[in-house]
């Protein structure tokens, strides 16, 4: 559970950093296509990635509990 909250905090921090960089219009020159996305699209992409990561972690925990291994 601690890892999930750490990942959530990191995702929020990254969102703030990306928003700040996009606001300053540095991102389009550094990354190109990513800079053409709106902030909402960028946020949705980060949220989907985070959600997939949390789902994968839960699946791993389920498998580990079934096999008797600790994570």
UniProtKB/Swiss-Prot annotation:
GO cellular component: extracellular region
Residues modified to Leucine amide: 34
Localization per Swiss-Prot or TrEMBL: Secreted
Listed GO biological process terms: regulation of defense response to virus
Keywords: Amidation, Antimicrobial, Antiviral protein, Secreted, Signal
Coiled coil: none
Leader peptide range in chain numbering: 1-23
Source organism, top-level taxon: Eukaryota
UniProt propeptide residues: 38-71
Main location: secreted
Keyword match Iron-sulfur: no
Tissue specificity comment: Expressed by the venom gland.
Family, per entry: Belongs to the non-disulfide-bridged peptide (NDBP) superfamily. Short antimicrobial peptide (group 4) family.
Miscellaneous field: Shows a low ability to inhibit hepatitis C virus (HCV) infection in Huh7.5.1 cells.
Job of this protein: Antimicrobial peptide.
Designated name of the protein: Peptide Ctri9819
Species name: Chaerilus tricostatus
